[in-house]
Amino acid sequence: MPQQNYLDELTPAFTSLLAIKEASRCLLCHDAPCSQACPAQTDPGKFIRSIYFRNFKGAAETIRENNALGAVCARVCPTEKLCQSGCTRAGVDAPIDIGRLQRFVTDFEQQTGMEIYQPGTKTLGKVAIIGAGPAGLQASVTLTNQGYDVTIYEKEAHPGGWLRNGIPQFRLPQSVLDAEIARIEKMGVTIKCNNEVGNTLTLEQLKAENRAVLVTVGLSSGSGLPLFEHSDVEIAVDFLQRARQAQGDISIPQSALIIGGGDVAMDVASTLKVLGCQAVTCVAREELDEFPASEKEFTSARELGVSIIDGFTPVAVEGNKVTFKHVRLSGELTMAADKIILAVGQHARLDAFAELEPQRNTIKTQNYQTRDPQVFAAGDIVEGDKTVVYAVKTGKEAAEAIHHYLEGACSC
């Protein structure tokens, strides 16, 4: 595939006629299972009904009521595990393509210049958010709507977190993310980049200047394996960030071996194929029936020509050769490649939050409140799923917990 395809979305968008046609397949369930299955409460049942009746503005309002990153989630959500898994239409033929319908609506919103969000009143005092990833961005919208003056502090040069630095542009175009963030800033949310807690500012400083602080730092650092400590390998998150920042203009090997089977591994493999790598192989210790990658990402990688080997774990490495053993069966497999990339997990840098007593990438909370009652946490660093839509969910719920705490509405 030509290199410029890195900037083109792999999945085509619905036209208005195709969107209405797809929405007309909906059985219009009274108590829609798809809506119950959405972690962010985006309410697909309601916005699909609006599409069916050609009320695209109403559909956009439904999405934005609960999801400030509706256009992002439309593209990156594992819908087959969530809303589409509950679709009643699946019992007839196939589930409604909810993600593409949501993408159609949010694209229509952007193209027609809708302004659903309004500026906040900022009457209830200041709240600081650490991290401009999906949890922090969603929390800022919820808090602004409640009347708070919100400032997000982001360590990178641009906001977005993993959405900007990790997800390939053929899955999430930069223009889509930029539009989401511009919409949030227009509400009155202040985003201060190049501000890292533990470097340019401290948690104590933010506590002194704000009524509450919400920590939403993500799992931005890639993990390695001891076996590969002295090998010439690249960590998956570093590769994805390098490709994204260069808009795909990077040197590509003739062959690549990715170790890992999650969504990040699939993103690495798909990126390599889109950019022209001839032979890309993913080797994962999980077998196919328990594969961690979403079906959408797995299928997309396979369609691009990625080879996937399941049930093998690395046991030895020599130069560009890796030897694997099957997790259940006897026998070994040795593979060589021009480039080896590790996609075996990610971790957060929480040294600056030692007073919150983080343990293994997690800050313990009760109703999102940490051991310090003024400090809350959400996103990847709290227990639960690590998808974007769950980050949106926790960001919204943490914002509501902050509001209840500050207003004395609960004893959380």
Curated annotation (Swiss-Prot):
Any coiled-coil regions, as ranges: none
SUPFAM superfamilies: alpha-helical ferredoxin, Nucleotide-binding domain
GO cellular-component term (any): dihydropyrimidine dehydrogenase (NAD+) complex
Keyword Oxidoreductase (UniProt): yes
InterPro entries named among the record's database cross-references: DPD_II, FAD/NAD-bd_sf, FAD/NAD-binding_dom, Helical_ferredxn
Catalytic activity: 5,6-dihydrouracil + NAD(+) = uracil + NADH + H(+); 5,6-dihydrothymine + NAD(+) = thymine + NADH + H(+)
Sequence intervals crossing the membrane: none
Chain residues that bind NAD(+): E286
EC number(s) stated in the UniProt entry for this protein: 1.3.1.1
Any one of the GO BP annotations: pyrimidine nucleobase catabolic process
Molecular function per GO: dihydropyrimidine dehydrogenase (NAD+) activity; iron-sulfur cluster binding; NADH dehydrogenase activity; oxidoreductase activity
Keyword DNA-binding annotated: no
Keywords: NAD, Oxidoreductase
Expression induction: Transcriptionally regulated by IscS.
Alphabetical list of Pfam families matching this protein: Fer4_20, Pyr_redox_2
Function: Involved in pyrimidine base degradation. Catalyzes physiologically the reduction of uracil to 5,6-dihydrouracil (DHU) by using NADH as a specific cosubstrate. It also catalyzes the reverse reaction and the reduction of thymine to 5,6-dihydrothymine (DHT).
Family to which this protein belongs: Belongs to the NADH dehydrogenase family.
Subunit structure: Heterotetramer of 2 PreA and 2 PreT subunits.
Name of the protein: NAD-dependent dihydropyrimidine dehydrogenase subunit PreT
Organism: Escherichia coli (strain K12)
Lineage: Bacteria, Pseudomonadati, Pseudomonadota, Gammaproteobacteria, Enterobacterales
